[in-house]
Curated annotation (Swiss-Prot):
The gene is NS. A motif (Nuclear localization signal) lies at residues 34-38. This is Non-structural protein 1. It holds the Pfam family Flu_NS1. The keyword Isomerase does not apply. One of its GO terms (molecular function) is protein serine/threonine kinase inhibitor activity.
């Protein structure tokens, strides 16, 4: 196993632990808590794939971070922070909409790269809106946290989520997954629209690579 893969996992585990302690003091906002929950699932998946114990990895990650901080001057830290591009977190969904359980009468699931697409094929003749929570950098979607399809009544009928065991995806991966979800939902004569934020940052409102723009609400 590559040593960089192991040390990266160890550092991620320790940093998650620090963020969890921060959240336990009721200091985190909704996007912070959302990322914390998602990252926990991702770490569990990575730990299972790598065959590493999370508690042991957290202790090792702490030692790595402490060593780095001992060698880091305040001035170097300021320069590093200033040079890192800042991403924005956009939320179409509330925390309740993101965490709500949902069920499918006729479930269909497909994996596209590192994204899992789920939809209920029993849904027919409905008006559906796609909402997503995601981060944006340089004017483009950076990381999809979660996308869900809602009927006008508020029922969840579809979802696109990152696979915890396969972290990392591009905006092109998200576009392809959205296309699959829309195609599946339209099969039963449903009308599908997307949120304005998703339209703007995932599709950029243009015909990139021959795709028509998605209909927005």
């Amino acid at each position: 196993m590559d040593s960089n893969t192991v040390s990266s996992f160890q550092v991620d585990c320790f940093l998650w632990h620090v963020r969890k302690r921060f959240a336990d003091q009721e200091l985190g906002d909704a996007p912070f808590l959302d990322r914390l929950r998602r990252d926990q699932k991702s770490l569990r998946g990575r730990g299972s794939t790598l065959g590493l114990d999370i508690e042991t990895a957290t202790s090792a990650g702490k030692q790595i971070v402490e060593r780095i901080l001992e060698e880091e001057s305040d001035e170097a830290l300021k320069m590093t922070i200033a040079s890192v591009p800042v991403s924005r977190y956009l939320t179409d969904m509330t925390l309740e909409e993101m965490s709500r359980d949902w069920f499918m009468l006729m479930p269909k699931q497909k994996v596209a790269g590192s994204l899992c697409i789920r939809m209920d094929q029993a849904i027919m003749d409905k008006k559906i809106i796609l909402k997503a929570n995601f981060s944006v950098i340089f004017g483009r979607l950076e990381t999809l946290i979660l996308l869900r399809a809602f009927t006008e009544e508020g029922a969840i009928v579809g979802e696109i989520s990152p696979l915890p065991s396969l972290p990392g995806h591009t905006d092109e991966d998200v576009k392809n997954a959205i296309g699959v979800l829309i195609g599946g939902l339209k099969w039963n004569d449903n009308t599908v629209r997307v949120s304005e934020a998703l339209q703007r940052f995932a599709w950029k409102g243009s015909n990139e690579n021959g795709r028509p723009p998605l209909p927005s609400k």
